[in-house]
Amino acid sequence: MKTTDLKSIKSIVLSFLYFDIEETEFSPIIVTHPIFESGIVMLPNSNKPYNILEDEDAYNEIIECYKNRIKKANSIDTLFYMIRKSYKLTFIKFIEKYLSIEDLSTLLAEAWTSSENPNQDVNVSLTQLTRMFKKTNKKYLMTEEEYEIYNNLPETFTVYRGVASGRNPKGMSWTQSLEVAKWFSNRFNYGNKGYIQQATANKKDVLAYFNRRDEDEIVINVKNLNDICIL
């Protein structure tokens, strides 16, 4: 049975650590980086904040601090939670070959359900996501309650997808709840109108069922849906 290769994964976390810190309109408070959420950090043995965008010594010290944390990490969870939510799916794409099936399953579920918009991750295609979901063990991918609901899905059933303005109509997140789809169709619209898609799904094509955010979510590749229409 394949086990998780922590040594190889640590080297990838280190490479993520050295990504350039990109500024945003809210910098230094908010930055774009796989690990750092802010350019303002607290250093060990110090009680004042430092701006690592301007202070090279502070930047080097915080990098050394993280390098030591990565080196001392003794579990995949410790490494995984160093990565920001918006980068977790990308991280999994890079470490997938070093993960046990159990760890791939639990981490993919966490990354998917914690991401604000996993269907439009520019670094991970829907084809790659589908392949990763197919590799998982569904008993580890889902909670006991989710797995029970998944097992009891009918052979064919109706699903909906709320598509807000500017969002991907071919995403993998669908739901059995029309009310949930309505909510998503109006999310982030800012005055523009979204819409609801309806389709027929086959149980054999369902990649996962998640309800940890009360969204009654059916994860399925849109290519496997039938009778897609707009309500």
Question: What are these regions, as identified by a protein language model?
Answer:
Residues 1-157, 164-172, 178-231:
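Conserved NAD+-utilizing ADP-ribose enzyme module
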